C-alpha cells in the first residue's frame, strides 16, 4: 500500500466519501482516546488490574492504524482492500462494545461512547466501499464524484517513465527503438541499407515513436527495387499483451496516461518499471500502472 511513496493526501482530497469520513473519523478517534484516558485515570481500580476500557485499548490503536493506512493509501489501494476490510470488521465488532458507554452517567464514559459510535459508522461506510464490486449500486453511490473509484488518484514518485516522444534513438549508425521497448526488434539500420535491402520489422513512426510494420523491400542486382507482398514474419516476436485487473481512469494532470476498463486486453510496448507503456484497443498509446495489469 505504501509502495515507497511519500505522503500525499491527494487521494483523500479528491474523493468525497473519503474526505467526509476522515473529517468525522479523526475527531472521533481523539474524543474516544481522550475519554478512555480520563476514565482510566478517574474510575479504574486502585491497583490498575481492572481497566475501564479493557479491550478498547487494543481497538483504539487498531483504529488508528487503519485510519492512517487509508489516509496515505496510493493507487494500489484496490490490491489491499480485502485485508483492510477484514481488519475494519474486527475494529467495528470491538467498537460496538465501546458504544455501550454512552448510556453511563460520567462524562468520560459518554465521551467514549460518542467517539466509538461515530467510528463505528465510519468503519461501516469504509467496509461497504472496499468490499463492493464495480458496477454495483452501492459502489456507484459511494463513488459518485470520485476520479475512478479505487484507482482515482495515481502517484509515481521514484518511478522513471520514458515518454513516447523520447523513445526513438540514434546511435552507432542505427535507427530503431531504444532499449526501453522491452525486447522489440530494431528498425532500419544503415548496415541493412548498404547491403541492398530493408529487413521487415518495426520501425519508428513519424508520430511519437509508435512502432509500425514496414513492408519488406528488396533490390536486385540491376538496382531495381521491388516490393514483396506483406506477410507474417515468423522471426518477429509478437508484442506482449496484458489484461486489466481493474478499471483505471487517467489522471487529468498527466496527458501520458491512458484509461482502460476492467478485463480489456492491452498491448504492452514496454514492461519495465512500475508504469508500463501500453497501447489500448482503440490505438491510444500511453502509460498505465503495472499493478493494475497482468501479463498474458
UniProtKB/Swiss-Prot annotation:
Residue ranges annotated for the SH3 domain, each copy included: 237-296
Stretches assigned to the Cytoplasmic side: 1-14, 73-81, 131-296
Transmembrane segments: 15-35, 52-72, 82-102, 110-130
A Pfam short name: SH3_1
Record membrane topology: Multi-pass membrane protein
Keywords, sorted A to Z: Cell membrane, Membrane, SH3 domain, Stress response, Transmembrane, Transmembrane helix
Chain ranges on the Extracellular side, renumbered to this chain: 36-51, 103-109
One GO cellular component, as annotated: plasma membrane
Places the protein is found: Cell membrane
PROSITE patterns per the UniProt record, alphabetical: SH3
InterPro entries: SH3-like_dom_sf (IPR036028), SH3_domain (IPR001452), Sho1_SH3 (IPR035522)
UniProt keyword annotation of GTP-binding present: no
Span list, region Disordered: 153-176
Chain's role: Plasma membrane osmosensor that activates the high osmolarity glycerol (HOG) MAPK signaling pathway in response to high osmolarity.
Family label: Belongs to the SHO1 family.
Assembly mode: Forms homooligomers.
Protein name: High osmolarity signaling protein SHO1
Taxonomic lineage: Eukaryota, Fungi, Dikarya, Basidiomycota, Agaricomycotina
Amino acid at each position: 500500500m505504501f509502495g515507497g511513496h511519500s505522503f500525499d493526501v491527494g487521494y483523500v482530497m479528491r474523493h468525497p466519501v473519503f474526505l467526509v469520513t476522515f473529517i468525522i473519523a479523526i475527531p472521533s478517534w481523539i474524543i474516544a482516546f481522550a475519554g478512555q484516558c480520563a476514565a482510566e485515570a478517574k474510575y479504574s481500580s486502585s491497583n490498575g488490574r481492572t481497566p475501564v476500557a479493557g479491550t478498547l485499548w487494543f481497538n483504539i490503536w487498531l483504529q488508528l492504524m487503519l485510519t492512517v493506512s487509508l489516509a496515505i493509501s496510493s493507487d494500489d489501494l484496490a490490491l489491499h482492500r480485502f485485508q483492510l476490510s477484514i481488519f475494519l470488521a474486527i475494529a467495528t465488532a470491538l467498537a460496538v462494545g465501546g458504544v455501550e458507554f454512552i448510556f453511563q452517567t460520567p462524562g468520560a464514559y459518554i465521551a467514549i461512547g460518542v467517539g466509538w459510535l461515530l467510528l463505528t459508522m465510519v468503519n461501516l461506510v469504509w467496509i461497504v466501499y472496499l468490499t463492493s464490486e464495480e458496477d454495483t449500486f452501492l459502489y456507484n453511490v459511494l463513488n459518485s464524484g470520485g476520479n475512478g473509484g479505487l484507482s482515482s488518484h495515481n502517484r509515481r514518485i521514484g518511478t522513471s517513465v520514458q515518454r513516447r516522444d523520447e523513445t526513438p534513438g540514434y546511435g552507432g549508425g542505427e535507427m530503431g527503438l531504444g532499449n526501453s521497448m522491452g525486447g522489440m526488434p530494431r528498425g532500419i539500420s544503415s548496415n541493412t541499407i548498404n547491403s541492398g535491402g530493408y529487413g521487415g520489422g518495426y520501425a519508428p513512426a513519424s508520430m511519437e515513436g509508435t512502432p509500425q510494420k514496414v513492408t519488406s523491400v528488396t533490390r536486385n542486382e540491376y538496382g531495381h527495387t521491388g516490393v514483396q507482398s506483406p506477410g507474417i514474419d515468423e522471426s518477429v516476436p509478437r508484442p506482449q499483451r496484458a489484461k486489466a485487473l481493474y478499471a483505471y481512469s487517467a489522471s487529468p494532470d498527466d496527458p501520458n496516461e491512458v484509461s482502460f476498463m476492467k478485463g480489456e486486453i492491452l498491448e504492452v510496448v514496454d514492461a519495465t518499471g512500475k508504469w508500463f507503456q501500453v497501447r489500448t484497443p482503440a490505438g491510444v498509446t500511453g502509460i498505465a500502472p503495472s499493478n493494475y495489469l497482468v501479463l498474458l
